[in-house]
Curated annotation (Swiss-Prot):
The lineage of its organism: Bacteria, Pseudomonadati, Pseudomonadota, Betaproteobacteria, Neisseriales. GO terms for molecular function: small ribosomal subunit rRNA binding; structural constituent of ribosome. One of its GO terms (cellular component) is cytosolic small ribosomal subunit. The gene is rpsF. NCBIfam families: S6. Binds together with bS18 to 16S ribosomal RNA. Pfam families: Ribosomal_S6 (PF01250). This is Small ribosomal subunit protein bS6. The keyword Transferase does not apply.
């Protein structure tokens, strides 16, 4: 299996649907015996340039380990989801698990850590 970093941005009017979208993508990865090493919700941020007259969007970062076929399925899902404005998939040499420098590490909502803490609390 290969390691990938995926960033996708969602239309700001669809921000409330981001958790359901992330859950759907997580199941696609885990059903194919893939692993999610890092999953961060960066929230709504200013775009560098307007996309379809939209100036802000909701960002999500995923570092995963899976097969190229699953990555193709994910990219197809991104392409046919009208809420996803842009997506980028990069193949990496190794798994990245530390917090991203984008938000200074601790500000980022790490969805994997949050899920692990909820499971430990129950």
């Amino acid at each position: 299996m290969r390691h990938y970093e995926i960033v996708f941005i969602v239309h700001p009017d669809q921000s409330e649907q981001v958790p359901a979208m992330v859950e759907r993508y997580k199941t696609m990865i885990t059903e194919a015996n893939g692993k999610i090493h890092r999953l961060e919700d960066w929230g709504r941020r200013q775009l560098a340039y307007p996309i379809n007259k939209i100036h802000k969007a909701h960002y999500v970062l995923m570092n995963i380990e899976t097969t190229p076929e699953v990555v193709g399925e994910l990219e197809t899902a991104f392409r046919f989801n009208d809420a996803v404005l842009r997506h980028l998939t990069i193949k990496t040499k190794h798994a990245v698990t530390e917090a991203s420098p984008m938000l200074g590490g601790e500000k980022a909502k790490n969805l994997l850590v949050g899920a692990a803490e909820e499971a430990a609390a129950q």
